[in-house]
Amino acid sequence: KAYTVKKRDIIRSYVGVDIDPAVLTEKAGFHSPTGQVMDSAWFKNFTGRLDIQDLTVNPKFDVEDESIDFFWTTEVIEHMKPEFIRPWLEDAHRVLRPGGLVYVSTPNHDGSNDKLPEDHVYEWGFRELHDELTRNWELDIVVGTFCQMPRLRKAMQKDMREEGEMRWTEDQFDILKARFGKQFLRVVAATFYPEIANNCAWILRKPK
């Protein structure tokens, strides 16, 4: 018997925060009787809410203490000056229930280019961001999402010199390269080397 999973079966309610009012306008191809995201059927299935807020001016969420299960932020941190990050994360900690899940994806400057993209204000280094995120939360896992191949090769060689083994063996690496090609290999191989990856995905939890 077929079963349709609706968004509301998984997510009871949702609060999204963005600085740009343009996010309230529905994209072409999605039906909205008013042209607004919040009037689209898919968004109503989320029981959602969208707040327009500049977190550098007001880092406080309009959310009750310990009332959310999941805090998700992707490609946001690099667009804010570092002094604004801690107040924002502190308030995320406030609204997250004990045992709640945190997902953070952001560039890792240790694996990136020295010259930042124009819209990146600041990119955190791997250890720097690790220390900030684990001030309040326990780290479940961090993985690289893609990397520069020369950096990966150097990291593998460093592992061999210092540990006597690599997180990827040369044979595994060559098989993956033959199967997926260089571009996809940048994604697969980065998983085990977050400290030198261009971008990292962090999964953390609020202690119970």
Feature map (PLM): residue ranges:
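Conserved SAM/SAH-binding beta-strand->alpha-helix loop
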Residues: 20-22
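Conserved SAM-binding motif I beta-strand of class I
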Residues: 12-18
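S-adenosyl-L-methionine-dependent methyltransferase catalytic module, highlighting the catalytic core
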Residues: 27-48, 52-60, 70-72, 80-97, ...
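Conserved SAM-binding loop of SAM-dependent methyltransferases across substrates and taxa
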Residues: 1-11
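Structural alpha-helical scaffold elements that stabilize or flank donor/cofactor-binding regions
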Residues: 7, 63-64
